[in-house]
Amino acid sequence: MLITQLKAKEAITSLTAGKKVFIINCHGCKEVRFPEKEAARLQKELAAEGNVTGIMTTDYICNPENMELRLKKHMSKIQEADLVLVFSCGVGVQTVSEYLEDKMVCAACDTYPVPGFQGVTPLEYKCDQCGECYLNQTGGICPITACSKSLVNGQCGGSKNGKCEVDSEMECGWERIYRRLKEIGRLDALKCPTQIHNFATDDELK
């Protein structure tokens, strides 16, 4: 199972301030605990500001074919928006980001793991369920899974010709992130301080 938890309200409003926003809710996998009431309350507050171009609630946006069919019905409202805010697990956010190449796509939730079935996650998108989602700083490409070293503060010095030094068949995750941020005009995100990933266990935090 997965648990999705809303990011801090301040973190979300800092992304949406002064922007037109299209919102996507995923109520898909029964294996995912989604904070519906909290999400609805926050979305109502955002809509009250008059900057929400539309809200789409669907299921299984981690399935690219299903997601594409659903999004096509809302494309005019999506094109009006400066930012697409996705309330889902990390895989859903990555799937939407890959499809909407010219849009800034942001995660409204962090994802946490619970042992058990993991839903219908396609293999080409991965979420490590780290509870500290970095997708908003990396253009919707997860540095934890796209980089073989799970680096969150930029490229290492070992990549060569765009390939990873650990796996020469693997494209450098941070080169992908750079290209994506350049494409959506967000290279400034690379200058922002990075919250280093916390690998401490629950027992160590007690």
Set out the residue ranges of the language-model regions.
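Iron-sulfur (Fe-S) cluster-binding modules
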Residues: 1-62, 71-84, 97-137, 141-206
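N-terminal glycine-rich "phosphate-gripper" loop used for MgATP/nucleotide binding
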Residues: 86-90
